[in-house]
UniProtKB/Swiss-Prot annotation:
The keyword Cell division does not apply. HAMAP family: IF_1. This is Translation initiation factor IF-1. Gene3D superfamilies: Nucleic acid-binding proteins. It comes from Desulfotalea psychrophila (strain LSv54 / DSM 12343). NCBIfam families: infA. It comes from the Bacteria. Belongs to the IF-1 family. One of its GO terms (cellular component) is cytosol. Pfam families: eIF-1a. CDD domains: S1_IF1. The lineage of its organism: Bacteria, Pseudomonadati, Thermodesulfobacteriota, Desulfobulbia, Desulfobulbales. Residues 1-72 form the S1-like domain. InterPro entries: NA-bd_OB-fold (IPR012340), RNA-binding_domain_S1_IF1 (IPR006196), S1_domain (IPR003029), TIF_IF1 (IPR004368).
Amino acid sequence: MAKEEAIEVEGTIIEPLPNAMFRVELDNGHKVLAHISGKMRMHFIKILPGDRVTVELSPYDLTRGRVTFRTKNTKKKK
């Protein structure tokens, strides 16, 4: 059996949870539970509430996902 392709969507971190888990609100309004990918954990990339992230969802369970990328904030600091 071939591995099914993951679905990539964007969303916003709502709240951090224990064990590197996060509640993420997707752009379409759905809320999913997501954990950090291994490379992000290895490189100590910090994720805070309000950050925009890319989440991979399995086609089998659309309520859980993996955070694969954190987009840079474009807000200017004064």
